[in-house]
């Protein structure tokens, strides 16, 4: 197995960066294939804390980083991140980072549109306000500017003028000021000098690496329940977030044959608006938030917390074709007398094991819980299954049963090696 795809199995913030960092040790290159700079990772490497948004985590381990065509790239944010990481001691160069030349450019006008559209909604989605959605809208509407277009000032001017005609019409309709072409063009041309050396046909680079048997790790952003088609729509991101997106978002079709590793917390969290059937607005929810440090890496927003929803997790596993699960933050549950897992829902008195797609039905959902005993012992830092209390082992087993996927990794603390390895995602499944 030379390809592993790491994606979130809940609503994001599951600790994917930590798992990617763990697996990157055995990888040759690490690929970002979706999203933008709206999702961040906090990693501790060699006792030092790093915060990344656009850059692949594998760069911190000396691996080749690739930003694929499925990512929308804000050049200002990218260069600021490169400079910040360099100031912290890690130089990012065209030898260590490749960016797909056909990736979409995120513009200041996308950020203006994001703010205007969010303010105009009757019910806010809770976007990060970084322009991700409008950039993906432009890509679908064939107005997008690709990074390769930065190389030709005349083409860039023409494409930018076309995009701004549309953007400014929408901004005017929403009562917002227009964005000016000349200042934006000047800034892009200045940024182009630094960005162009990183551009490559990423699909070709990855195809050659795959043919040579190199190990390729795909680093997903957001999560399955934020997928634009299969998530809790419309409270979702604007792109595909599942393992299948790794193929189209990188240009490496064979990514679809890799090991799909879904990352999920031992409980559930969500940032911003949208359905959350198992949300806890009580002392237990507050405890999970504080003990789990549930605040956004990029935004600092407090996360909503609740019990694990195994019904939605099972949906993520099935829709995403997930091969196994990495369970994180098990130690946050230490000290609770009992735990609850949502196994399905009642809608108008009818029991069902799938979450409704219709907005009206969602408003009538009541979660159905299974109660399990908690544990008082500490699981923090446990590095073997035998080191866990029996109740914790039973909880992990039940999650795997309900989700329909084996648990291959369990994270039990903040240190990089606080992990129980039950199976190696890089190795072929037994019998396969």
Curated annotation (Swiss-Prot):
One of its GO terms (cellular component) is cytoplasm. Pathway: Purine metabolism; AMP biosynthesis via de novo pathway; AMP from IMP: step 1/2. Binds 1 Mg(2+) ion per subunit. SUPFAM superfamilies: P-loop containing nucleoside triphosphate hydrolases (SSF52540). It catalyses: IMP + L-aspartate + GTP = N(6)-(1,2-dicarboxyethyl)-AMP + GDP + phosphate + 2 H(+). IMP binds at residues 13-16, 38-41, 128, 142, 222, 237, 301. PROSITE patterns: ADENYLOSUCCIN_SYN_1. The keyword Metal-binding applies. Keywords: Cytoplasm, GTP-binding, Ligase, Magnesium, Metal-binding, Nucleotide-binding, Purine biosynthesis. GTP binds at residues 12-18, 40-42, 303, 329-331, 411-413. This is Adenylosuccinate synthetase 1. It comes from Chromobacterium violaceum (strain ATCC 12472 / DSM 30191 / JCM 1249 / CCUG 213 / NBRC 12614 / NCIMB 9131 / NCTC 9757 / MK).
């Amino acid at each position: 197995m030379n390809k592993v795809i790491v994606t979130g199995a809940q609503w994001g913030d599951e600790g994917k960066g930590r798992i990617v960092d763990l697996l990157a040790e055995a990888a040759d290159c690490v690929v970002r294939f979706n999203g933008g700079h709206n999702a961040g990772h906090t990693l501790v490497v060699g006792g030092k804390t790093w915060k990344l948004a656009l850059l692949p985590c594998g760069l911190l381990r000396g691996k080749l980083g690739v930003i694929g065509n499925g990512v929308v790239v804000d050049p200002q944010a990218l260069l600021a991140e490169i400079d910040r990481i360099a100031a912290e001691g890690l130089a990012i160069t065209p030898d260590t980072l490749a960016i797909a030349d056909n990736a979409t450019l995120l513009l200041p006008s996308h950020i203006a549109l994001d703010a205007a559209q969010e303010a105009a909604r009757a019910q806010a989605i809770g976007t990060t306000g970084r322009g991700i959605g409008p950039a993906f809208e432009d890509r679908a509407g064939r107005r997008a500017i690709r990074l390769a277009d930065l190389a030709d000032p005349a083409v860039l001017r023409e494409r930018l003028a076309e995009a701004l005609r549309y953007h400014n019409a929408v901004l005017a309709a929403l009562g917002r000021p227009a964005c000016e072409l000349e200042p934006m063009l000047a800034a892009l041309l200045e940024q182009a000098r630094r960005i162009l050396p990183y551009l490559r046909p990423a699909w070709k680079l990855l195809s050659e690496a795959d043919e040579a048997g190199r190990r390729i790790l795909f680093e997903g952003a957001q999560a399955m329940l934020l997928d634009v088609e299969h998530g809790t729509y419309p409270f979702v991101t604007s792109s595909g977030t599942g393992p299948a997106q790794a193929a189209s978002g990188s240009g490496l079709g064979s990514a679809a044959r890799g090991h799909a590793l879904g990352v999920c917390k031992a409980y559930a969290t969500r940032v911003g608006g949208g359905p959350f059937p198992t949300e806890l607005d009580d002392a237990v929810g507050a405890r999970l938030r504080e003990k789990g440090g549930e605040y956004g890496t990029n935004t600092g927003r407090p996360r909503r917390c609740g019990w694990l929803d195994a019904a939605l997790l099972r949906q993520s596993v099935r829709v995403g074709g997930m091969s196994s699960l990495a369970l994180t933050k098990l130690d946050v549950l230490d000290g609770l007398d009992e735990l609850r897992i949502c196994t399905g829902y009642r809608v108008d008195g009818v029991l069902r094991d799938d979450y409704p797609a219709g907005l009206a039905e969602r408003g009538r959902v009541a979660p159905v819980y299974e109660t399990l005993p908690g544990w008082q012992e500490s699981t923090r830092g446990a590095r073997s299954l035998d080191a866990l209390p029996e109740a914790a082992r039973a909880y992990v087993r039940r999650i795997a049963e309900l989700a329909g996927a084996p648990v291959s990794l369990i994270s039990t603390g903040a240190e990089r090696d606080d992990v129980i390895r039950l199976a190696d995602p890089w190795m072929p499944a037994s019998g396969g």
